[in-house]
Regions:
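Hydrophobic membrane-insertion alpha-helices, especially the h-region
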Residues: 10-27
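Soluble "head" domains of membrane/secretory-pathway proteins
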Residues: 2-6, 21, 36-174
Length: 174
């Protein structure tokens, strides 16, 4: 009986180690908690994110231990990629956003229009209206498809006055 318990404990420990390795170095599940990526990713969507696409850092490990500030086997993401990162403010909160700027790019929002490297990003209204939950209020806003200079596109959300409203600003280390 004691041998069987020891075998079961070993099996559980091996399973936990394998799960930790997969989650840390291969794929990690994420949950979409807000409407900031609608209509592409909806509230409640679940997805697996590749951990090896852009290399490894201390954030690849659970609890982001301060072992190193370097990134290993790194590759820069491309403009238009959906990325997951930890905000530098608390180093714990995961954000899922679309990348529109690369190192060296200049990004400006002038009168509600997006400029990338002094180039006004052209936008076409998408034939949908998005409902965004803002506390106790639900906003109906228009969605626009914006064409980036390298041919990739992303969806930006504007309010009724035409001002971009999904303008979260983060500086994310390479």
């Amino acid at each position: 009986m004691k041998k069987k318990i020891i075998e079961n404990v070993k099996t559980i420990i091996y399973a936990l180690i394998i799960a930790l390795i997969i989650r840390s170095f291969l794929f990690q599940p994420f949950y979409i908690p807000s409407s900031s990526m609608e209509p592409n990713l909806l509230i409640g969507d679940r997805l697996f994110v590749s951990k090896y696409s852009y290399g490894y850092s201390r954030h690849s490990l659970p609890f982001s231990p301060n072992l190193t500030n370097k990134r290993y086997l790194s590759k820069l993401p491309e403009r238009g990629d959906v990325i997951v990162f930890k905000t530098p403010v608390d180093n714990r909160t995961d954000y899922i956003k679309r990348l529109i700027g690369l190192p060296g790019d200049t990004i400006q929002i002038i009168d509600g229009d997006l400029y990338l490297n002094n180039y006004k990003i052209q936008r076409n209204k998408v034939e949908i209206t998005i409902n965004i939950n803002c506390g106790s209020e639900i906003l109906n806003v228009n969605a626009f498809e914006e064409k980036l200079p390298n041919g990739k596109t992303y969806i930006a959300v504007y309010n009724k006055e035409g001002t971009m409203i999904n303008t979260d600003k983060f500086i994310v280390p390479k």
